[in-house]
């Protein structure tokens, strides 16, 4: 079955340079930066985890490739469940409140992981709570995306593209820092504290977002 979804964007830029000229307007807008920060931070957790997670699995828990693969699948499951929840409650909760809720849940994940790992040394103590963290991220992404494109409505396309670029850059930088420092610190503590820091920053940026 084929359905023609007609074009809905009629204010197209003449060329790429015309689009780039709109970036200063976005870059100087707090309404753009706050949801973009939340969006980028909620994505950077994957950069941290997918560098730190395998290191912890091999160096700390000495897991087999099969078990490590199972443990590394938890983030995907959490993210999907978060997306499903958003689709059910988006009509009754504002996008800003969804961002705040997601940030709180994201923050709780590594806190629980850190607590359990220090009291009970087991792979699931570290990896299972990560599902909670990505569940929060799954709530944040759709909500923050909506806020980004609403920041300056006539620049929605530019905002979406620039926001995604910032998200990718921040995630890459987080992964870079993880790769540098994890070898010199306690791997579990470092990953958890780094993720907790991201959760705190995500919470404050979502809390300060001025929803339109």
Cite the ranges covered by each PLM segment:
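Juxtamembrane intracellular "pre-TM" segments in multi-pass secondary transporters
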Residues: 6-36
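A late C-terminal transmembrane helix in Major Facilitator Superfamily
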Residues: 145, 149-184
């Amino acid at each position: 079955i084929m359905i023609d979804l007609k074009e809905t964007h009629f204010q197209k830029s003449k060329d790429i340079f015309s689009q780039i000229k709109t970036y200063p307007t976005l870059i100087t807008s707090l309404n753009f930066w706050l949801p973009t920060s939340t969006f980028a931070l909620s994505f950077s957790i994957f950069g941290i985890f997918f560098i730190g997670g395998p290191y912890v699995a091999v160096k700390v828990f000495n897991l087999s490739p099969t078990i490590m693969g199972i443990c590394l699948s938890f983030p995907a499951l959490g993210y999907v469940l978060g997306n499903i929840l958003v689709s059910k409650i988006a009509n009754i909760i504002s996008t800003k409140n969804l961002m705040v809720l997601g940030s709180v849940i994201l923050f709780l994940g590594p806190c629980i992981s850190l607590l359990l790992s220090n009291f009970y040394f087991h792979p699931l103590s570290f990896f299972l709570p990560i599902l909670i963290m990505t569940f929060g991220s799954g709530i944040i992404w759709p909500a923050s995306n909506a806020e980004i494109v609403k920041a300056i409505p006539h620049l929605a396309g530019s905002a979406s593209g620039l926001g995604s670029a910032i998200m990718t850059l921040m995630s890459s930088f987080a992964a870079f820092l993880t790769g540098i420092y994890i070898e010199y610190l306690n791997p579990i503590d470092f990953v958890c504290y780094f993720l907790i820091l991201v959760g705190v920053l995500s919470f404050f940026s979502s809390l300060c977002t001025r929803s339109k």
